[in-house]
Regions:
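C-terminal accessory subdomains/tails of enzymes that are appended
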Residues: 1-172
Length: 172
């Protein structure tokens, strides 16, 4: 609490609650979920997500990002490089906006970082080669991967995921 008092005083922020009662960034209380989901759907639709995917994409984004979910899609709409990217990643049904957000706001710089730490794609039972290729393309477009390194990065990640996690990559 003493650190909070010092830092907040320096920043000119009011202290609202004690540490144990303060909301964490992205925290979404159940009573706020419906409003956040509604706003996320609206922003996702404006960002180009196909109508038939909006419900699933919104639920996934709110589940992963909490109250930051609408910002994921707003960030995509403000990113000039992202304008040339498709709205969904491969055949995953996940929004390209999430990968762009992870790169721009969470400093994801590699395929492994996107898959294992940012988008949590290591956990669903199916991960396709098409999804890996699209993620690599997003990294290229965003300037994090050289075009010549795209295919080697995908092949290296496939081997890594198989060796470390026993993850089979679907090629269809």
């Amino acid at each position: 609490e003493e650190s909070v008092r010092k830092v907040f005083a320096e920043l000119g922020f009011p202290i609202i609650d004690k540490n144990s009662q303060r909301v964490l960034p992205g925290c979404l209380y159940e009573e706020d979920r419906e409003a956040c989901d509604s706003r996320t759907k609206n922003v996702a639709a404006r960002s180009g997500i196909p109508e038939e995917s909006i419900e699933a994409v919104s639920q996934w984004a709110v589940g992963l990002y909490g109250r930051r979910a609408p910002h994921v899609f707003e960030n995509m709409m403000q990113c000039s490089q992202a304008a040339m990217l498709p709205p969904l990643i491969g055949d995953s049904g996940l929004p390209t906006a999430a990968a762009v957000f992870a790169i721009e706001q969470e400093w994801a710089l590699s395929l492994g970082d996107l898959i294992e730490r940012r988008l949590m794609l290591i956990f669903p039972p199916q991960l396709s080669l098409a999804t890996l290729h699209d993620l690599a393309e997003i990294l290229v477009v965003m300037g994090c991967l050289q075009p010549a390194d795209r295919e080697p990065a995908v092949l290296s990640e496939v081997k890594y995921l198989q060796d470390l996690y026993g993850k089979k990559i679907v090629t269809q």
